[in-house]
Amino acid sequence: MSLMDPLANALNHVSNCESVGKNVAYLKPASKLIGRVLNVMQDQGYIGNFEYIEDGKAGVYKVDLIGQINKCGAVKPRFAVKNHDFEKFEKRYLPAKGFGLLIVSTPKGLMTHDEARSAGVGGRLISYIY
């Protein structure tokens, strides 16, 4: 059986581990995109430290959970969003205005929707978290 979307699988695993009260989640296979999404989540205070562990295959991310995540997931399909259209997707994926964040892939790298809006850039929606 092949893995169709490693990012969606990783975020679903984090959400499930968080909901049952685990302190650590192991995400495999590891990828650069998953690492960058974890970096944004760490910068925003949703997860603790995370580290990459080489296992001879695709690698594993060990993520320390701190109990801040209610729900997280990947956005499929990855919608293209202009910098003034974020509010429409906030209403669709987030429970309330100003609560949670959308992670966006922009020409300037991965960032939250608030950072993208203030930088004046659009991009593709990658995931949501609250």
Swiss-Prot record:
Keyword field contains RNA-binding: yes
GO biological process assignments: translation
GO molecular function: rRNA binding; structural constituent of ribosome
GO cellular component entries: ribonucleoprotein complex; ribosome
Keywords, alphabetical: Ribonucleoprotein, Ribosomal protein, RNA-binding, rRNA-binding
Entry annotated with the keyword S-adenosyl-L-methionine: no
Superkingdom: Archaea
Pfam families (UniProt xref): Ribosomal_S8
Membrane spanning stretches: none
Entry-linked PANTHER family: 40S RIBOSOMAL PROTEIN S15A (PTHR11758)
Functional summary from the UniProt entry: One of the primary rRNA binding proteins, it binds directly to 16S rRNA central domain where it helps coordinate assembly of the platform of the 30S subunit.
Protein family according to the UniProt entry: Belongs to the universal ribosomal protein uS8 family.
Subunit organization: Part of the 30S ribosomal subunit.
Full protein name: Small ribosomal subunit protein uS8
Lineage of origin: Archaea, Methanobacteriati, Methanobacteriota, Methanomada group, Methanococci
